[in-house]
């Protein structure tokens, strides 16, 4: 069933959310984080919420959109297609944030349709803290017509970093709690198989959080998470619990006030799990 293109431009607004120290710390632990910026209150200025915690506090409009029957999306067949974050100002425990979202596009492809929307999140001072662009892929809404050719991602010969992350068995259950992503494909093996998946798959935003950690650990001075200004990923294939992921980073270009880096993420079979991923670092 095709998605309803008449919803393009439709807007949503979340209720205010107060950032919980307990939950922001829980979120950091849920993707194997070890950066004291998220844990050590003895630091000058205290702790910050992990930038990737925006997957929870900026997702209010997303939750509304998912249950909006007017769109025609079949959540049983939805996977995350791509994600972009721009972090503008630090978010700390105790802050109150509100998000507004707007549906921006619907793209019909052979094997499904892409639903895209953007969100803007502001704090209690009306300062914009995060901008985000989200895309879901509804596998039940394809055209059946072959897609045009896409450009292959250029693979560099030299890398700035090459590091690995072990996906824990049980990672999806741990990540589901603070992120709010309880989609059955992440926590119910039988359900995941019924909708054509090999079993439980890892939340795409958990894989993105791994990539963010790699960028902070290897591309910033003193592992400063506030130096990573943007991160974009497209999800290439499912990540499974127990897999070992390899992340590699390389320089793309020097911009006016920041540098753009590419990120490659591979599973233990050497297949890419993220595609066209990049970040900018101040």
Please provide the spans of the model-predicted regions.
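HotDog/MaoC-like acyl-thioester-processing domains
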Residues: 1-7, 12, 78-164, 239-282
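Short amphipathic alpha-helical surface patches that serve as generic macromolecular interface elements
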Residues: 208, 212, 228-232, 242-245
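Hot-dog-fold acyl-thioester-processing enzymes
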Residues: 1-80, 143-148, 154-225
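Small/polar glycine-rich anion-binding or flexible loop at a beta-alpha turn
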Residues: 43-46, 227-240
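Short leucine-rich amphipathic alpha-helical surface patches
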Residues: 212-219, 235, 239, 249, ...
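Short, surface-exposed helix-loop/turn micro-motifs enriched in polar/charged residues
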Residues: 111-113, 223-227
